[in-house]
A protein has these predicted regions:
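Nucleotide and nucleotide-moiety/phosphate-recognizing core
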Residues: 2-131, 140-154, 161-162
Length: 163
């Protein structure tokens, strides 16, 4: 687990995200506990490749690229992977979006990196953020309701549908 710190200090979380993309030595500060990378989406074939399942699509691609195999858990599918110098567990909650928080209630927010779709970002845009509100996203609202908002989010822009 990451050490407790001032909630306004986002440095350790952002260092955790950057560690995924490093292939050389880790930054000073000691080992970081293996994070859970959570892809938000809805289970079932009818939702499989919809834009709102962008989180599922990202963790599926990470599992494919890093030889992860999905295993069923109580309320999620999990795939342990090695990402650069960091081991992580990819998670796909098997609850519907509005109940995602119940699938993550056993996890500490500081160990989560939540990947989700964002209507307000242009399609293909990616932003990393720590903390904040739900922004109208029901999956985030559910997680925040259970765990608070102190977790890393990777926002995947899907844009608004044409009017």
């Amino acid at each position: 687990m990451l050490p407790r710190r001032d909630p306004r200090d986002r440095t350790s979380r952002l260092r955790l995200v950057r560690s995924f993309f490093k292939t050389d030595e880790r930054e000073e500060g000691g080992p970081i506990r293996s994070p859970f990378v959570v892809g938000l989406g809805n289970p079932g074939r009818s939702y499989g490749r919809t834009r709102h399942n962008a989180g599922y699509l990202v963790v599926d691609e990470l599992a494919k690229r890093h030889d992860g195999s999905w295993r069923k858990r109580k309320k999620a599918e999990a795939a342990p992977v090695s990402l650069g110098l960091t081991n992580a567990t990819l998670l796909k909650p098997t609850t519907f979006m509005n109940n995602t928080g119940s699938a993550l209630s056993d996890h500490r927010p500081e160990n989560l990196i939540v990947v989700h779709d964002d209507l307000d970002l242009e399609a293909g845009t990616v932003r990393v953020k720590v903390g904040g509100g739900a922004g109208g996203h029901n999956g985030l609202r559910s997680i925040i309701g259970r765990l608070g908002n102190d977790f890393v989010r990777v926002r995947i822009g899907i844009g608004r549908p044409p009017a």
